[in-house]
């Protein structure tokens, strides 16, 4: 890693994190698979939910022991909440259980698309900020909603790339890039819809600050390998963004300039 990228840490609410990858902890085939994926991706944070469900019904005690062993900062979420009251209550319960003021605020407005409820999201975010939480709201790429969330005290946003669990990658590149361009100083972490490492690399090349992954890793045939691949994709995309990519052109442009005679003719032309 170059000095340029090594000095470039993710900063949220004044705190710095070692990685721009955030990993969810749901739906892994086993606790060992989850543990291996965390070790492979070395995430800055891992998300946890009070309503967590894991395939195989693994004991909760083992799950929390695993998290303590990896010593990665926890980001509780309000997954499954559909009302403001439910989200606020769940956030307060999560603070008591996990001992942290961090909260990933999820408030779903549609069961089919799992799209966030923008009105309820703003109301819940405002209340939780007043209650002392560091709120990371899961939202769409809607610029106006993003600004309203910032107005009520959120210091970072988590816009989706596509609906949760679809793996489609970014379905509205224009909207997501406009959000980045219009909010240049706000930490933006793409959350939901990414399916393969190239999706993560792409949004990092656009200047996004990080990605949150769950299904793309947990439902891969080999989660540990996929987790490592995503971490590498995020690192490559961020490095490319910092390097300053060339501008795309509509016409061809020779990479080697033609100046004077070919080198083999410059000394009399003979071999």
Curated annotation (Swiss-Prot):
Keyword presence, Cytoplasm: yes
Disulfide bonds: none
Catalytic activity: [ThiS sulfur-carrier protein]-C-terminal-Gly-aminoethanethioate + 2-iminoacetate + 1-deoxy-D-xylulose 5-phosphate = [ThiS sulfur-carrier protein]-C-terminal Gly-Gly + 2-[(2R,5Z)-2-carboxy-4-methylthiazol-5(2H)-ylidene]ethyl phosphate + 2 H2O + H(+)
Residues annotated as catalytic: 104 (schiff-base intermediate with dxp)
E.C. code: 2.8.1.10
Binding site for 1-deoxy-D-xylulose 5-phosphate: 165, 192-193, 214-215
InterPro entries (UniProt xref): Aldolase_TIM, Thiazole_synthase_ThiG, ThiG
GO molecular function, one term: thiazole synthase activity
UniProt-annotated location(s): Cytoplasm
CC per GO annotation: cytoplasm
Residue stretches in coiled coil: none
BP GO terms, sorted: thiamine diphosphate biosynthetic process
Alphabetical list of Pfam families matching this protein: ThiG
UniProt keyword terms in alphabetical order: Cytoplasm, Schiff base, Thiamine biosynthesis, Transferase
Main location: cytoplasm
Pathway(s) served: Cofactor biosynthesis; thiamine diphosphate biosynthesis
PANTHER family registered for this protein in UniProt: THIAZOLE SYNTHASE
Record family assignment: Belongs to the ThiG family.
Subunit structure: Homotetramer. Forms heterodimers with either ThiH or ThiS.
Function: Catalyzes the rearrangement of 1-deoxy-D-xylulose 5-phosphate (DXP) to produce the thiazole phosphate moiety of thiamine. Sulfur is provided by the thiocarboxylate moiety of the carrier protein ThiS. In vitro, sulfur can be provided by H(2)S.
Protein's UniProt name: Thiazole synthase
Originating species: Burkholderia lata (strain ATCC 17760 / DSM 23089 / LMG 22485 / NCIMB 9086 / R18194 / 383)
Lineage: Bacteria, Pseudomonadati, Pseudomonadota, Betaproteobacteria, Burkholderiales
